[in-house]
Curated annotation (Swiss-Prot):
Enzyme Commission number(s) from the entry: 3.1.1.96
InterPro entries: Daa-tRNA_deacyls_DTD, DTD-like_sf
Predominant subcellular localization, coarse grouping: cytoplasm
CDD domains: Dtyr_deacylase (cd00563)
UniProt function note: An aminoacyl-tRNA editing enzyme that deacylates mischarged D-aminoacyl-tRNAs. Also deacylates mischarged glycyl-tRNA(Ala), protecting cells against glycine mischarging by AlaRS. Acts via tRNA-based rather than protein-based catalysis; rejects L-amino acids rather than detecting D-amino acids in the active site. By recycling D-aminoacyl-tRNA to D-amino acids and free tRNA molecules, this enzyme counteracts the toxicity associated with the formation of D-aminoacyl-tRNA entities in vivo and helps enforce protein L-homochirality.
Pfam families reported for this sequence: Tyr_Deacylase (PF02580)
Catalytic class of the enzyme: hydrolase
Superkingdom of the source species: Bacteria
NCBIfam families per UniProt: D-aminoacyl-tRNA deacylase
Record keywords, A-Z: Cytoplasm, Hydrolase, RNA-binding, tRNA-binding
Protein name as annotated: D-aminoacyl-tRNA deacylase
Domain notes: A Gly-cisPro motif from one monomer fits into the active site of the other monomer to allow specific chiral rejection of L-amino acids.
One GO cellular component term: cytoplasm
Length: 152
């Protein structure tokens, strides 16, 4: 399972004109399930996303997780957006292959599981809409972007 996380000042996701998720300071996570991924892999990836220290402490070092973005216990937002293209095989030719991605029904199930688990562990969770054509807007903070991957 893959998450591309970006530290943001703010971010939102829309389907058409409808805002489906919006956060202030926090993390935008583009999330992808790969073939063979399990709920255990989703749990492991979520622990990594929630614990990854990408926010600056008082000394200016990236030392704080999304649950404590200011060092005083204030949680940041977590915007979760499904993006199967993260699993693309780009090793040959000029057209990506999406064979490594989980089939749509399994991808949806694992994304929904990931969202539910995130909501159980973090106070501010917003989402996109699985399988929809979405428009994602964000103001990167840094920029700070990390590729997190957990193998099943």
């Amino acid at each position: 399972m893959i998450a591309l996380i970006q530290r943001v000042k703010r971010a939102d996701v829309r389907v058409g004109e409808r805002v489906t998720g919006e956060i202030g300071a926090g993390l935008l996570a583009l999330v992808c399930a790969e073939r063979g991924d399990t709920e255990a892999a989703a749990d492991k990836l979520l622990a990594k996303v929630l614990g990854y220290r990408v926010f600056s402490d008082a000394a200016g070092k990236m030392n704080l997780p999304v649950s404590n973005i200011d060092g005083a216990g204030r949680a940041g937002g977590l915007l979760l957006v499904s993006q199967f293209t993260l699993a693309a095989d780009t090793n040959s030719g000029l057209r990506p292959s999406f064979t490594p991605a989980a089939p749509p029904d399994e991808g949806a199930r694992l994304f929904d599981y990931f969202v539910a688990a995130a909501r159980a562990r973090h106070p501010i969770v917003e989402t996109g809409e699985f399988g929809a054509d979405m428009q994602v807007s964000l103001v990167n903070d840094g920029p700070v972007t990390f590729w997190l991957q957990v193998r099943p």
